[in-house]
Amino acid sequence: MRIIFYLTLLLFIFNKVKSDNCTIGGLTATSCNETSQQYYFTQDKFTSEDIIQIPFGAKLYFSGDVVFNYPVNFNCQPSLKKELSRFVYEIDCLQVFSNGTITYNAEEIYCSVDFSTVFDIDTMVDKPVDMVESWSRFMKPTKGFGETKVYEPVVYSRIKAQAGYKCDFNPGFRTSRRVPDKYALHSKCAWAKALFPAGDFNIRITPCNLQNNSESVRKLEEIGFDKNFYMEKLDFTPTDGLFYNGNRESIYIRYYPNFEKKFDLSSIQDIFDSYLYIINYCEDNPNKFEISFGMQSDLWDHRAFNLTDFQLVKNVNGTFEGSATRNQISIMVLILSVLLVLIL
């Protein structure tokens, strides 16, 4: 009995010491149980000050309101669930709980999904498999986002597939067929099939004052790019894949990895052609405009988005042609100067 008592005491002391260091994803909790990965925050209002990385299996409990001003990275894994006579995979990335409201003001939310344990590689599946129709409650808390000006944030996907498989990611705030009041992340995985890469476009239109031109905004909405391939960024009002930001007079388009449509400069020519009638509809000097766009090929690392060195301008016959920007010219001048110095 004495031995059991001392063992219990040692376990209590050990757990107490562990709980004194309640740091999770860059946050320090008021208390925690590290064994069960449960972390408790007792503030009346919690506001994030940096990017938060929530490890797989961890749960964060907040007593009051929560405001995420910086990106949050959730980590989750599919689990089998029996539905009627069949089994389906389901992902529930619920890792943040609050007695108050949860508001996402962050530019992005990330969702890391581990699919590596899902497939039986011996089956050699030769067609896309509808692997996950998940409902992810972090995307829209029960009590809403709090502020009406806060739009639903983008979810980046970091998909880890089993060897030989590749998975696409069709994001969106589409209602789950199985759980109508929840939103779904849809993904398909295929064996030995080409997966086209992802990319970003930040299209700036000048001199159109779209913010004060309701007709132009309506024209933008009529384009309706395929929402399976395009997604909004925070502060962009969603339509069917095309998103308008009145403050910056720009359009942001995100192209996710997919099995069906290759992402390259030529594939978006039709997109720019579609803007012709929109731009010409603008009241401010409709015959003079230019479109510049930025491109980022890797969405899986958190990097600042920068406008790149490619610019499109309208020429006399109404088509688009590429032209180097001042940055390109400056770099070329610098290189030539260095070469001349070396030669002389």
Curated annotation (Swiss-Prot):
Propeptide: 323-344
Cleaved signal peptide residues: 1-19
Cellular component terms (Gene Ontology): plasma membrane; side of membrane
Location of this chain's protein in the cell: Cell membrane
Keywords: Cell membrane, Glycoprotein, GPI-anchor, Lipoprotein, Membrane, Signal
Membrane protein topology class: Lipid-anchor; GPI-anchor
Name under which the protein is recorded: putative uncharacterized GPI-anchored protein DDB_G0275411
